[in-house]
Design a protein with these regions (language model features):
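Active-site/catalytic core of tyrosine-dependent DNA strand-transfer enzymes
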Residues: 156-199, 203
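Conserved tyrosine-mediated DNA breakage-rejoining catalytic core shared by Y-recombinases
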Residues: 126-165, 233
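Basic, Lys/Arg- and aromatic-enriched nucleic-acid-binding interface segment
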Residues: 93-121, 125
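DNA breakage-rejoining catalytic core of tyrosine-based enzymes
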Residues: 71-72, 82-98, 147-157, 169-172, ...
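Catalytic-site neighborhood detector that most strongly recognizes the C-terminal catalytic loop/helix
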Residues: 147, 227, 233-252
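Short, charged phosphate-coordinating catalytic segments
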Residues: 114-137, 221
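C-terminal catalytic core of tyrosine-transesterase DNA break-rejoin enzymes
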Residues: 112, 116, 208-230, 237
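N-terminal core-binding DNA-recognition domain of tyrosine recombinases/integrases
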Residues: 1-87
Length: 257
């Protein structure tokens, strides 16, 4: 997986899926049959996104295993998962404001990086003061995203100042870990869950950013790039159309010439 330049987070996820499945099947990979694997996954109440991710992990593992050990690939039986198109779920601003009011400065910054700059949990974890840039238009942050891809996101003066103020001396990490590096994406996700009222999460802060960014300029391609999506179709799942735009669209259908 490292040879394919997969991110450490993706590698950890793939390994976790394979290990969980191995514990559930209680046998060596060479003993797994297509019927066993299909029966096992069919008992899991996974949402479509989780199921899609698990199937991808298992298909990759068994493709490698069957190639190395000349073994029938049982994962070929796994069907294609139809991924749903969930509605955007931006956190209401009043709930976000309440959560921010009770935060320490560092915890507040974690929420703001997702809500005001659209960062994923893994991207928040990797924020470093050295990634702040400035030009004639203001400050920006170099974001280290999925698949080792980078993007540049404009940030406010206040956000830039908070990043610099809270950065660990010497390393520049805003969320330093115990080993001289940074915390894990899971740590940031759990932090968000502890600070936000249920069912709101760090991911719904990204939805909030996408919705507000689109409402400001109605430029879906710009929002796509800000969020770091590979396609506009993904961005559409993050953006709740402004109510005034929905009303104008509906009203236009009421006119009969």
């Amino acid at each position: 997986m490292r040879a394919r330049s997969l991110s450490p987070e993706t590698i950890r996820t793939r390994l976790q899926h394979v290990r969980t499945t191995a514990r559930g099947l209680e046998c060596a990979p060479s003993k797994v049959t297509p019927e066993m694997l299909l029966e096992y996954v069919s008992t899991k109440p996974w949402q479509s996104e989780t199921r899609h991710s698990y199937y991808a992990s298992l298909k990759q593992f068994f493709a490698w295993y069957s190639r190395i050990y000349r073994y029938e690939n049982p994962a070929l039986v796994l069907p294609t998962v139809k991924r749903g198109s969930p509605m955007p779920r931006p956190i209401p601003d009043n709930l976000l404001a309440e959560a921010l009011a009770g935060c320490t400065p560092r915890h507040r910054l974690a929420l703001e990086l997702a809500a005001l700059a659209g960062l994923r949990s893994g991207e928040v974890a990797r924020v470093n003061a050295g990634d702040i840039t400035v030009d004639l238009l203001g400050y920006s942050l170099v974001v280290h995203g999925k698949g080792n891809k980078q993007r540049v996101v404009p940030i406010t003066d206040d956000l830039a100042a908070a990043i610099r103020d809270l950065a660990e001396p010497g390393t520049g990490w805003v969320f330093p870990g115990a080993d001289g590096g940074h915390v894990t994406p899971r740590w940031i996700s759990k932090l968000g869950a502890s600070l936000l009222p249920s069912p709101w999460t760090m991911h719904t802060l990204r939805h909030r950013f996408g919705t507000h960014a689109y409402a400001g300029d109605r430029d879906l391609v710009a929002v796509q790039r800000l969020l770091g999506h590979a396609s506009v179709s993904t961005t559409q799942r993050y953006v709740e159309p402004p109510s005034d735009a929905m009303r104008r669209a509906a009203n236009s259908a009421q006119i009969i010439d």
